[in-house]
Amino acid sequence: MSASVPATASADPLTRYEAVVGVEVHCQLRTASKMFCACSTDHDGAAPNSHVCPVCLGLPGALPVINRRAVELVLMTGLAIDAATPAATRWDRKNYFYPDLPKGYQISQYDLPLASAGRLTVETGDGPVTIGITRAHLEEDTAKLVHATTPDGRKVSLVDYNRSGTPLMEIVTDPDIRTAEQARRYAEELQLLLRTIGASDADMERGQLRVEANVSLRPRGADAFGTRVEVKNMNSFRSVERAIDFEIVRQAAALDAGETLRMETRGWSDDRGETYHMRSKETSDDYRYFPDPDLPPLHVAADWLAGLRAEVPELPAARRARYEADLGLSPYDARVLAADPDATALFEATLAADPSMTAKAVANWVTGEYLRLRNVASPGAAVHVHAAELAAIIRSVEAGDISRANGKEVLAAHATSGAAAVDLIAERGFRQISDRTALAEAVDRVVAAHPAAVADYRAGKQQAVGFLVGQVMKATRGQANAAMVQETVRERLDAQP
């Protein structure tokens, strides 16, 4: 059938069918060198084929050496998802032929993964859902194909082997996911977990996190699985949800029309908003897995695993729960903070710098102004905020020494210059006038200079108060305490006959 969904397709096929979805995630591990050689993984922007050696080029006689840190990061991920760890594992060759695979096989793990039988609980619109994780295993990445056109118009495909051999972790769920939203939430939570434990930067835009989905439908109440279709090329979390939603509707329309679905791999087109046929789906038998004779089995000692367990930090779900239960934060603030490791670190450090401040006050500044500064910063620009300086700014605002608007300006200046908050406040003359006598004199001058506004107030126009307050703030170059100014203006207006 056509990739396009018929107009007659049911708007809600899940009333007749149950979707069965499994998600496979490949993430690039945060290591300095490749999986089986010493070549650097920092090849963004590097000249093609400049980070290569005989091992990652697959040259005859070159022997692989295991990257210990890559193994540790997968073991830590297994601990974070409450998975089982084997006493020993091994490496297998996954055989297939493609230009981006220099050896003609990929070193992976087949039946003895480093982690198995894990789980991850995610929050959805219908409440928490626990998704089983079948396995997490190590493998090496392929090279990158670059498709180009020569000056004389010929279509060519070029191979850049800089990426070849980069350590990857593949994480495969059980077929526990029932909606596209659940799949998206799972991918988002997994990205956060990987970043929190330091396993991966997991940046989808840079190809460090790749999500694939296996989607099938079965009639409501049936036990047997339907025909599985793999969906690739989903380059954002929104794409994950859109692609799975589309595939559910497409398969339902085909089944309703009496068609037989085929096992295939389909790509997702963000522009067209639909999936398209790529190739027939391979099975594990097609890859002819067998143990790699160049790599010995790997034994996971209990003391090694215990040391890695101590490295695993507080996980996002536990952190959200603590922020709500112990610090009294709203679910929104807890979620936003826990979703950003840098924001979490700044929040925690600022509270530690001044325990007298409320968690809510600090959360407001971190989730509001700090994240805003990060979002508006130019690409590659550094936004560094020191916890002690943020604490000083918050104290100054809450004490009424500076206005909140000026506090935001001080924070922005500190983030780019690193200057101390107290010096920035002094340089800019932001210290608020809170002396009641001085404020009263400024208010009296403004009230006397604007009799029309006074008359408007007498006539019941409350906006006149705002006008007069604004004039006082202008006259004091924004240094007056706005709350005290408003209070004094009302006192003066109400006291006049």
What is the meaning of each model-derived region?
Residues 15, 328, 352-362, 399-402, ...:
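Structural motif
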Residues 161-166, 204-211, 220-221, 432-497:
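C-terminal non-catalytic interaction appendages of large macromolecular assemblies
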Residues 206-219, 287-288, 324-348, 359-376, ...:
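Core structural elements
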Residues 298-299, 334, 346-349, 358-361, ...:
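Extended hydrophobic-aromatic, low-complexity segments
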Residues 304-311, 318, 349-357, 390-402:
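Extended, non-catalytic structural segments that build the interaction scaffolds
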Residues 381-395, 401-475:
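Strongly charged, low-complexity linkers/loops
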